[in-house]
């Protein structure tokens, strides 16, 4: 009997070893693919602003310069994205709008991240009534219609960037707070936090030095999604005429200027729109790569 069991045990051991080897190879392949995804996303989101800086140095074309003798030109070497109804070079306007869109996206996302992480960490670490108050506020913010919320701030501050900055920041922090609080509930029970308390470290030092660094990873993924969302929101508001005001170029307003000619001159709204999509895909790839690398089971969509 013992002799019969020995071969079966050996076979089971070999099968287990092969399964473990397959899992290791799969994990290694996923980590490599996540790195490729992150690099590709970075190439896109860095390449667009770099091009917006370098290309105007090579092309002496002003974004607001009008040429009524060259209106509605097809894409060409001289005008890769064509010209609009008053003869302005569309590519020059897209590149002129790039710094503004990135600035709004990064500034509002960073502000939301800082506010949300602090409030979420406080709620998760201390719990009790403070946790209840903060999380009920988060529930209210998330339940409120996003675009209506931002439009309310624009109504208060007037059309332009001020209301957009405030609206995007005030609304966006709730998502970071919810994720941070969920992570903090687990982190506060870890042994290194208990050891820090035993050593008599202050609560602020425990939070800043030991707890917060361990809740930031999932927030990086949320930050990529928020960046995409904020850039798209700015473009949407400018498309509707309540965002960036003329003559300042903005991706959404450029698409709005070309929508009238969609059937006859399709490139006017389509090519700037593709730039918006490309940037959104770039940030989403970075977020997906981070999620894969650290094992988070959610994905970003544009």
Which role does the model predict for each range below?
Residues 148-152, 160-165, 169-175, 219-254:
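Non-cytoplasmic
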Residues 80, 84, 114-115, 124-187, ...:
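Generic hydrophobic transmembrane alpha-helix motif, especially the helices
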Residues 83-88, 125-126, 185, 195-214, ...:
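Short helix-to-coil transition segments within interhelical loops
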Residues 1-46, 285-302:
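Transmembrane alpha-helical segments of polytopic membrane transport and secretion proteins
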Residues 90-125, 279:
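Transmembrane alpha-helix signature in integral membrane proteins
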Residues 153-157, 184, 233-276, 299-302:
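Glycine-rich helix-loop "coupling/hinge" segments at transmembrane-helix boundaries
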Residues 171, 217, 221-227, 266-302:
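C-terminal transmembrane helix and the adjacent membrane-cytosol boundary/short C-terminal tail
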